Amino acid sequence: GAGPAQLRTLLRRISGVDAVLAEIGALGAEVRYRRVLGAVAELEALAVGGAALGERISGFLSRDDTVVARMAAALDMAGDMAGEVAGETAPGDPSGHLARAVRWQRYSRASGSDLHRACGADIARGSLRLWSQACATLPGERPVEREDPA
């Protein structure tokens, strides 16, 4: 006899529930990404209005965390339009971020739709931030020695 875990696995496989859940997630990804773009556009419009508030909003929109969050939303949408993207970069390999940035920048320039151009640009921008955070160098270059701030 099969144990409870094996039975659950078998039922999930037979029912196709995982495929249904994946499809629902993919369909929602574009809606979520459009909402992110809409919120960013509203914040950018508010930033134009006031000096102090505008600086705070601009600072928020340009923070690494915000840029990477936009990239994550774009990657969710890109998973549906460009195949599986989660495995694009090897964990712990900063050069993978640079390669992904180049690939998605090219994609954004070649795309015919505004949505896909924005998506590619957000992925490229976020990938460059992650690459920069990892203190990566260009292929063939030696890493720059950083001074210890202590």
Kindly give the residue locations of the regions a language model identified:
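Non-catalytic alpha-helical scaffolds
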Residues: 1-150
